[in-house]
Amino acid sequence: EVIAPASLDMDIRLVSVIDDSVGADALLTRGGETSLQELKGKRIGVGMDTVSHIFLMLLAQEEGCSLDDYELVDFSSPSNGATALVTGEIDALATFEPFITSCMNADDSISIVADTSAYPTMINDSIVFSGNILDTRFDDVVKVMECFYQAVDYWKENPDEANEMLGKYLDCSGEEFAETMTKLNMLSAEEAYAQMTAEGDDSWTASMSAMSSFLLERGRISQDIAPSDYVDTSVLAAITEN
């Protein structure tokens, strides 16, 4: 969702990775299948060109499958996709929390085929600003990100109170929100900066480069794009130096 607009030459800057998905994204099924191979010919719900779609494509690559072997049903609304799985309109669903938990709570026959706990650096959430805003209001962007990391620190230090407050925004209880957050590794500013500036074949930058090539090969973007074209670590550098 960052690489695609960047590949269209949109002036966006990814200023921080904020978490790694360690189970917050998954492929669910109604039929007890334990692999994507076993779902061949079935109807799979997914938001096309979303993170869930990318997860499904990567999973297909891991298992040596082609998504042409499945009937993909596009759901722009994740809640509609969850409803379709629970009611049996589709056989499987690529989705994310809190919809994973809500589906499994609604029907105990629904189970996880695969999730990102097995691929901890595959899916990240990040914060992106327009290049113009970053260039003209850098200090304000730093303040926004400082506030964000203060909120993360508050959540870590006051989990019970924070989970209750945040759960209200997702129409779930504090306990349900807490369960959802066990599937995300929330990064501090220092951890995010270290992850985004690390080098090597197993680094975050290498993963982003590989993701761009993967999307290009599958026709999801029209040109390959390097992380250096859209990643800007200057905000995190300013925060971590203070």
Where do the PLM segments sit?
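Short phosphate-engaging motifs
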Residues: E1, G23, S35, S52, ...
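Phosphate-coordinating loops and pocket residues in cytosolic domains that bind phosphorylated ligands
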Residues: G41, N105, D232
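Short, glycine-/small- and polar/acidic-enriched structural segments
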Residues: E1-S66, L72-S77, D91-E97, V113, ...
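Secondary-structure end/capping motifs
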Residues: D135-R220
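Helix N-cap/coil-helix junction residues
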Residues: M10, E33, C65-L67, C172, ...
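Conserved C-terminal helix/tail region of periplasmic/extracytoplasmic solute-binding proteins
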Residues: M208-N242
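Pocket-lining segment of extracytoplasmic ligand-binding domains
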Residues: V73, S79-L170
